[in-house]
C-alpha cells in the first residue's frame, strides 16, 4: 500500500497573433494579438496498492483532483472583453488536474520477457476548467464523458546489459463542439513507442526512447445565422483542429 502526494507547479506562455479576412469583400474577420504568462500550483494526494503473486503483478493508483488556478500576467491582449477574455491581466482561471484512476497488471513470461496492460480514467467532467467562450459555464460540462486511456507494452532483456521495449496507447476524450475552441482543444489519439535501456555501470543505466502520436482531426462546423454564424460573420464555416507529436527521450538512472 502507498500513501503520498505530489506538488505541481505550472508555468506557461501564450504568444502569437491571428489575422483573418473574408475573400468575398476583403472585410476583416479576426485580428487579435496575445502575449500572456501563466503560473499556478496545487497538491495532489495519491493512494496506491500493489500485489504480487507468482508471475503476476497487479497494481492500482488513485490520484485525487488537484485544485489549480492559473493566474495571468499579460503584456499584450488586443481583445480582453471578447475572444481573449480568459487572458486578462491578473485574472485567475480554474485549470484543475482531474482525479485519475489507474489499474494495471503485468506478467513475467520468462526471466527475460515481461508484458503489461493498463487502464487510466481521468474524471475531467468534475475538474474545474475555463468557461465556454461567451458563457459562464465551465468547459468540463461540455464533455460527454471523462478521458479513457488503454495501454499495453512489453520488454525483453537481450542480455544482462541491454533491454528493449515497445508499447501502444489509445486515448479517447469525450469531445464536443462547445469544448473545442481556437485557444484550447484536444484530439483523440493513439501512440506507439519504442525504447531501450543500457546498463553502463553496475549502478548506472541509460534509458532511450522514441514516442510517436497520431491524432484524429476534430471538425467543428458552424451553421449560418443572422445573429451569429462563423466568428460573427452570419456565414457558415468550419474549423478543423489537428496536431502532431513526436518525442525523443534520453535519461539516466543511478542506484545509490
Predicted segments, located by residue:
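Outer-membrane beta-barrel porins/channels
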Residues: 1-256
Amino acid at each position: 500500500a502507498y500513501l503520498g502526494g505530489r506538488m505541481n507547479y505550472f508555468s506557461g506562455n501564450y504568444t502569437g497573433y491571428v489575422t483573418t479576412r473574408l475573400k468575398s469583400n476583403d472585410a476583416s474577420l479576426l485580428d487579435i494579438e496575445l502575449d500572456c504568462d501563466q503560473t499556478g500550483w496545487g497538491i495532489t494526494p495519491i493512494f496506491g496498492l500493489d500485489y504480487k503473486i507468482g508471475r503476476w503483478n497487479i497494481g492500482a493508483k488513485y490520484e485525487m483532483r488537484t485544485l489549480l488556478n492559473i493566474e495571468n500576467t499579460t503584456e499584450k491582449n488586443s481583445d480582453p472583453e471578447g475572444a481573449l477574455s480568459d487572458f486578462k491581466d491578473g485574472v485567475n482561471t480554474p485549470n484543475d488536474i482531474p482525479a485519475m484512476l489507474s489499474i494495471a497488471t503485468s506478467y513475467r513470461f520468462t526471466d527475460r520477457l515481461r508484458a503489461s496492460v493498463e487502464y487510466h480514467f481521468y474524471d475531467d467532467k468534475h475538474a474545474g476548467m475555463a468557461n465556454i467562450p461567451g458563457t459562464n459555464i465551465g468547459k468540463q460540462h461540455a464533455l460527454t464523458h471523462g478521458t479513457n486511456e488503454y495501454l499495453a507494452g512489453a520488454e525483453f532483456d537481450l542480455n544482462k546489459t541491454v533491454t528493449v521495449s515497445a508499447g501502444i496507447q489509445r486515448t479517447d476524450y469525450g469531445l464536443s463542439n462547445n469544448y473545442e475552441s481556437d485557444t484550447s482543444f484536444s484530439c483523440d489519439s493513439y501512440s506507439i513507442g519504442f525504447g531501450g535501456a543500457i546498463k553502463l555501470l553496475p549502478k548506472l543505466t541509460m534509458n532511450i526512447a522514441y514516442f510517436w502520436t497520431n491524432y484524429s482531426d476534430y471538425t467543428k462546423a458552424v451553421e449560418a445565422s443572422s445573429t451569429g454564424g462563423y466568428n460573427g460573420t452570419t456565414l457558415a464555416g468550419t474549423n478543423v483542429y489537428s496536431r502532431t507529436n513526436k518525442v525523443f527521450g534520453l535519461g539516466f538512472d543511478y542506484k545509490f
